[in-house]
Regions:
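Glycine-rich phosphate/diphosphate-binding loops that line cofactor/substrate pockets in enzymes
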Residues: 1-4, 30-32, 109
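Residues at the starts of beta-strands that form the adenosine-phosphate
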Residues: 4, 34-37, 71
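Short, glycine-rich nucleotide/cofactor-binding loops
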Residues: 6-20, 45-53
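Structural beta-sheet core signal
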Residues: 7, 38-40, 74
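Histidine-anchored nucleotide/phosphate-binding helix
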Residues: 18-33
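Short, glycine-/small-residue-enriched flexible loop/hinge segments at domain edges that mediate gating
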Residues: 33-50
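A glycine-rich helix N-cap at a beta->alpha junction
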Residues: 54-84
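C-terminal structural segments of small proteins and small subunits
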Residues: 87-111, 116
Length: 118
């Protein structure tokens, strides 16, 4: 049975290694025929203000993850705080607010996903 993993990234640009590992692991899980979803929570929506820039050093990694459809949701409350709502929309990413403005864990748990947080 293929693994199902939901990775909740909470770290913003002040902790780049967490974003890098989230994206590397997501691509690795997909490559190994697992199902993976990345969720941007906490400070992570701030990445949407810098990663879409082709001159950013990690733009290529971000673009691979985005093009693969692995970014499942962006927390709406956190995107509002980060002033990243427009950036999420421009990137075609889904803003979710089903748990008091944040992304609920329950749809992922009910679908059999393991939850990983960074």
């Amino acid at each position: 049975m293929a693994e199902k993993v939901a990775i909740f990234l909470f770290a913003g640009p002040e902790m780049p290694c967490r974003m890098i590992h989230t994206f590397i692991w997501a691509l690795d899980i997909q490559r190994r025929d697992g199902e993976v979803k990345v969720i941007l929570e906490g400070e992570a929506p701030r990445w949407l203000l810098v990663l879409p820039d082709p001159d950013h050093g990690r733009h290529g990694l971000y673009q691979k993850v985005k093009d693969a459809g692995l970014i499942d949701a962006v927390c709406k409350a956190c995107a509002v705080q980060a002033r990243a709502v427009e950036a999420a929309a421009e990137e075609g990413l889904r803003l979710v607010h089903d748990a008091s403005g944040h992304v609920s864990l329950m749809p992922y748990i009910e679908a059999g996903f393991r939850i990983v947080t960074l």
